[in-house]
């Protein structure tokens, strides 16, 4: 008899202007398990990490993510750095990192192990045209087209 236990995958990110790169990332993350939960970065976290506020507030970013078929649930992260408490509550089997997220996989595994979680941490590769599938590049193109 097989187990009915679902494999839970968790990803996190800003997801400010959803683009094809995000969709490819979410699809690949979903393929790692049965259930995909997205932690969308809190507005304060975006300001701190990117040096600017997000274009869209966290509630709007979460709503857009919920509409993507690969996503089973979305939670808004707490202000500040990655919340180990939130991850502990979500009980992931796998955490999938994006190719441009600046977390060290082994360091994250150690931190998770220190709070009693044995989680597989995987860095996913770029699956789409990285010169186009980056929010910063989209903002640059919008600025070039509409602000000249």
From Swiss-Prot:
EC identifiers of the protein: 2.7.7.2
Pfam families reported in the protein's UniProt record: CTP_transf_like
Keyword Hydrolase: no
Biochemical pathway: Cofactor biosynthesis; FAD biosynthesis; FAD from FMN: step 1/1
GO biological process assignments: FAD biosynthetic process; FMN metabolic process
Catalytic function, reaction form: FMN + ATP + H(+) = FAD + diphosphate
Binding sites annotated in the UniProt record for ATP: 14-15, 19-22, 100
Keyword set, alphabetical order: ATP-binding, FAD, Flavoprotein, FMN, Nucleotide-binding, Nucleotidyltransferase, Transferase
GO molecular function: ATP binding; FMN adenylyltransferase activity
Cofactor(s) needed by this chain: a divalent metal cation
Keyword Flavoprotein: yes
Origin: domain of life: Archaea
Quaternary structure annotation from Swiss-Prot or TrEMBL: Homodimer.
Family that this chain belongs to: Belongs to the archaeal FAD synthase family.
Function: Catalyzes the transfer of the AMP portion of ATP to flavin mononucleotide (FMN) to produce flavin adenine dinucleotide (FAD) coenzyme.
Classification via HAMAP family: FAD_synth_arch
The protein, known as: FAD synthase
Species of provenance: Pyrococcus horikoshii (strain ATCC 700860 / DSM 12428 / JCM 9974 / NBRC 100139 / OT-3)
